């Protein structure tokens, strides 16, 4: 009889204790995008699902997106931008909805995914000579505006010549801007010399 009473009380208590969850002292709660909302606390962001469960814990590497007049991280096609600092230079990559890094931070800038593609600035290192006295390679860096797939592979180069860049924090204090924009799934516009636009059609 005593065991039955204890079991009965446990059945009553468990649903009550498990039915509510509070997340306190939040600075901001975003609207839902793809059934996930960003929440901010003490300078870090996390993601909750539609029943208020934290599915990605608070972290400081999530990249915010401008939505109207407000900035907050979003998932777009199951990818969210992240940022990592290496030698005081920002590199961008992506996580999936489990919080796993699926595209390692490697781009000098990157955009959200749209129709299975995203714009990014891919960094290329060119070894042009070798300093025999110092036993060091002489290298130059440039970046290309590319269209990547959801695995981070560059599918198309929108500016094949690239843009020379000095990979130093004193010269690269902010991420370079992405000048291209997506017009449709297979059509992109790239701003070249004299601020003129070039339309580029890529393979589906």
Regions found by a protein language model. Name each.
Residues 1-23:
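Bacterial Sec-dependent N-terminal signal peptides
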Residues 21-204:
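Residue-level detector of conserved, function-critical positions
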């Amino acid at each position: 009889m005593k065991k039955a009473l204890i079991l009965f009380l446990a059945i009553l208590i468990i649903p009550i204790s498990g039915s509510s969850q509070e997340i306190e002292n939040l600075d901001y709660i975003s609207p839902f995008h793809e059934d996930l909302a960003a929440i901010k606390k003490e300078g870090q962001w996390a993601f909750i699902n539609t029943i208020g469960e934290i599915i990605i814990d608070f972290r400081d590497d999530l990249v915010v997106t401008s939505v109207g007049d407000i900035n907050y991280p979003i998932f777009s096609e199951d990818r969210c931008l992240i940022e990592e600092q290496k030698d005081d230079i920002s590199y961008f990559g992506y996580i999936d909805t489990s919080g796993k890094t699926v595209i390692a931070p490697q781009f000098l800038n990157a955009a959200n995914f749209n129709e299975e593609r995203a714009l990014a600035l891919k960094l290329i290192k060119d070894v042009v000579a070798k300093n025999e006295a110092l036993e060091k390679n002489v290298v130059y860096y440039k970046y290309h505006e590319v269209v990547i797939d959801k695995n981070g592979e560059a599918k198309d180069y929108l500016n094949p010549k690239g843009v020379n860049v000095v990979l130093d924090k004193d010269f690269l204090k902010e991420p370079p801007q992405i000048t291209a924009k997506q017009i449709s799934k297979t059509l992109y516009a790239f701003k070249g010399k004299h601020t003129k636009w070039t339309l580029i059609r890529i393979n589906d």
